[in-house]
């Protein structure tokens, strides 16, 4: 068991040292593309995907609607999604720690510290995204009446960089949690194997003793030894069955958590669609009214120009 956790710690420390090396320049990734290579199925991974999907949906809206939403709505929605993601990460980490069982306290504390550091980096990346949108909103408000194309380009560039960093740290956390979970499952299996190894010699001793008693004693002693042997073997099988049932229960709990997250994802998607429909119903009358006012203004200007052109020759005469 200790050898397993020593190997686990070496793996995590090697990952930390690898992070200190500066990575090679990454190719540019457009915000509209999907997460490359992201195959997450855990609740926290799906929550993180919903965070970025919502941000990409906001960027597909028109300029006027987007600037109106950035006043309060988008920042609040991103905050809720960010909190949901970090909550799922924390819940998944605590669940793995419960499955870990009794191990060396120093080793468990070191591994837990590494996971908390990776979790903190992911939270910092998401806060940077939210802060960049808040800064963009302030700059847009300060430049009312001027072109905001430069600000939008700067925002897109910053979000691309933040997205790369967010993806890198999310993959790092995903790998660490996978190693952590593998260690927990392997530790449980090793515990079952250790029990079988300890009881195996006892079973063999029981068989040998039963054979010896059978040759030296009566048939009654032989039957009692055989009964003891059967009882001991039944106990070993029962302990093995309990261990397998425990592993199966753990898998069922993970499936239940995954189903709940999928249900939440469906609800959020329906809420987003309803919200989009409300936006459309709000702004379509406004746009139509502006078009009518503009058409009336153009008509008045044309009429005024026609009047001035007819009055000018009469004044010359």
UniProtKB/Swiss-Prot annotation:
<dbReference type="GO" id="GO:0060999">
    <property type="term" value="P:positive regulation of dendritic spine development"/>
</dbReference>
<feature type="region of interest" description="LDL and other lipoprotein receptors binding">
    <location>
        <begin position="158"/>
        <end position="168"/>
    </location>
</feature>
<feature type="repeat" description="7">
    <location>
        <begin position="212"/>
        <end position="233"/>
    </location>
</feature>
<dbReference type="GO" id="GO:0010544">
    <property type="term" value="P:negative regulation of platelet activation"/>
</dbReference>
<feature type="region of interest" description="Lipid-binding and lipoprotein association">
    <location>
        <begin position="210"/>
        <end position="290"/>
    </location>
</feature>
<keyword id="KW-0732">Signal</keyword>
<dbReference type="GO" id="GO:0008203">
    <property type="term" value="P:cholesterol metabolic process"/>
</dbReference>
<dbReference type="GO" id="GO:0005543">
    <property type="term" value="F:phospholipid binding"/>
</dbReference>
<feature type="repeat" description="1">
    <location>
        <begin position="80"/>
        <end position="101"/>
    </location>
</feature>
<dbReference type="GO" id="GO:0006898">
    <property type="term" value="P:receptor-mediated endocytosis"/>
</dbReference>
<dbReference type="GO" id="GO:0034360">
    <property type="term" value="C:chylomicron remnant"/>
</dbReference>
<dbReference type="GO" id="GO:1903002">
    <property type="term" value="P:positive regulation of lipid transport across blood-brain barrier"/>
</dbReference>
<keyword id="KW-0677">Repeat</keyword>
<dbReference type="Pfam" id="PF01442">
    <property type="entry name" value="Apolipoprotein"/>
</dbReference>
<dbReference type="GO" id="GO:0043083">
    <property type="term" value="C:synaptic cleft"/>
</dbReference>
<dbReference type="GO" id="GO:0043537">
    <property type="term" value="P:negative regulation of blood vessel endothelial cell migration"/>
</dbReference>
<dbReference type="GO" id="GO:0005783">
    <property type="term" value="C:endoplasmic reticulum"/>
</dbReference>
<dbReference type="GO" id="GO:0034382">
    <property type="term" value="P:chylomicron remnant clearance"/>
</dbReference>
<dbReference type="GO" id="GO:0051044">
    <property type="term" value="P:positive regulation of membrane protein ectodomain proteolysis"/>
</dbReference>
<dbReference type="GO" id="GO:1905890">
    <property type="term" value="P:regulation of cellular response to very-low-density lipoprotein particle stimulus"/>
</dbReference>
<dbReference type="GO" id="GO:1905906">
    <property type="term" value="P:regulation of amyloid fibril formation"/>
</dbReference>
<dbReference type="GO" id="GO:0034384">
    <property type="term" value="P:high-density lipoprotein particle clearance"/>
</dbReference>
<dbReference type="GO" id="GO:0034363">
    <property type="term" value="C:intermediate-density lipoprotein particle"/>
</dbReference>
<dbReference type="GO" id="GO:0010977">
    <property type="term" value="P:negative regulation of neuron projection development"/>
</dbReference>
<dbReference type="GO" id="GO:0060228">
    <property type="term" value="F:phosphatidylcholine-sterol O-acyltransferase activator activity"/>
</dbReference>
<dbReference type="GO" id="GO:0120020">
    <property type="term" value="F:cholesterol transfer activity"/>
</dbReference>
<keyword id="KW-0445">Lipid transport</keyword>
<dbReference type="GO" id="GO:0034447">
    <property type="term" value="P:very-low-density lipoprotein particle clearance"/>
</dbReference>
<dbReference type="GO" id="GO:0045893">
    <property type="term" value="P:positive regulation of DNA-templated transcription"/>
</dbReference>
<keyword id="KW-0272">Extracellular matrix</keyword>
<dbReference type="GO" id="GO:0006641">
    <property type="term" value="P:triglyceride metabolic process"/>
</dbReference>
<feature type="repeat" description="8">
    <location>
        <begin position="234"/>
        <end position="255"/>
    </location>
</feature>
<keyword id="KW-0558">Oxidation</keyword>
<dbReference type="GO" id="GO:0042803">
    <property type="term" value="F:protein homodimerization activity"/>
</dbReference>
<dbReference type="GO" id="GO:0008201">
    <property type="term" value="F:heparin binding"/>
</dbReference>
<feature type="binding site">
    <location>
        <begin position="229"/>
        <end position="236"/>
    </location>
    <ligand>
        <name>heparin</name>
    </ligand>
</feature>
<dbReference type="GO" id="GO:0042470">
    <property type="term" value="C:melanosome"/>
</dbReference>
<dbReference type="GO" id="GO:0090090">
    <property type="term" value="P:negative regulation of canonical Wnt signaling pathway"/>
</dbReference>
<keyword id="KW-0345">HDL</keyword>
<dbReference type="GO" id="GO:0031175">
    <property type="term" value="P:neuron projection development"/>
</dbReference>
<dbReference type="GO" id="GO:0016209">
    <property type="term" value="F:antioxidant activity"/>
</dbReference>
<dbReference type="GO" id="GO:0055089">
    <property type="term" value="P:fatty acid homeostasis"/>
</dbReference>
């Amino acid at each position: 068991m200790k050898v397993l956790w020593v190997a686990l710690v070496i793996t995590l420390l090697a990952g930390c040292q690898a992070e200190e090396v500066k990575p090679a320049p990454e190719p540019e990734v457009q915000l509209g593309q999907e997460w490359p290579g992201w195959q997450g199925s855990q609740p926290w991974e799906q929550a993180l995907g919903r965070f970025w999907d919502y941000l990409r949906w906001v960027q597909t809206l028109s300029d006027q609607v987007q600037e109106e939403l950035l006043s309060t709505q988008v920042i609040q929605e991103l905050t809720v999604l960010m909190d949901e993601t970090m909550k799922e990460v924390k819940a998944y980490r605590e669940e793995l720690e419960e499955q870990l069982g009794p191990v060396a306290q120093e080793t468990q504390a070191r591994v837990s510290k590494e996971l908390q550091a990776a979790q903190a980096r992911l939270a910092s990346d998401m806060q940077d995204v939210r802060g960049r949108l808040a800064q963009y909103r302030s700059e847009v408000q300060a430049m009312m009446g001027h072109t905001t194309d430069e600000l939008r380009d700067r925002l897109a560039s910053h979000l691309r960089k933040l997205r790369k960093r967010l993806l890198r740290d999310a993959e790092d956390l995903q790998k660490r949690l996978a190693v952590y979970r593998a260690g927990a499952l392997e530790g449980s299996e090793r515990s079952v194997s250790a029990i079988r190894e300890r009881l195996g010699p006892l079973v063999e001793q029981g068989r040998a003793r039963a054979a010896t008693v059978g040759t030296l004693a009566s048939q009654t002693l032989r039957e009692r030894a055989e009964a003891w042997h059967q009882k001991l073997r039944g106990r070993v099988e029962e302990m093995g069955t309990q261990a397998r049932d425990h592993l199966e229960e753990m898998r069922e709990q993970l499936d239940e958590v995954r189903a709940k997250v999928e249900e939440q994802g469906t609800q959020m998607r329906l809420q987003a669609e309803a919200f989009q429909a409300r936006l459309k119903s709000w702004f379509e009358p406004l746009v139509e009214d502006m078009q009518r006012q503009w058409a009336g203004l153009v008509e008045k200007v044309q009429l005024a120009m026609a009047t001035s052109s007819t009055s000018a020759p009469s004044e010359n005469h």
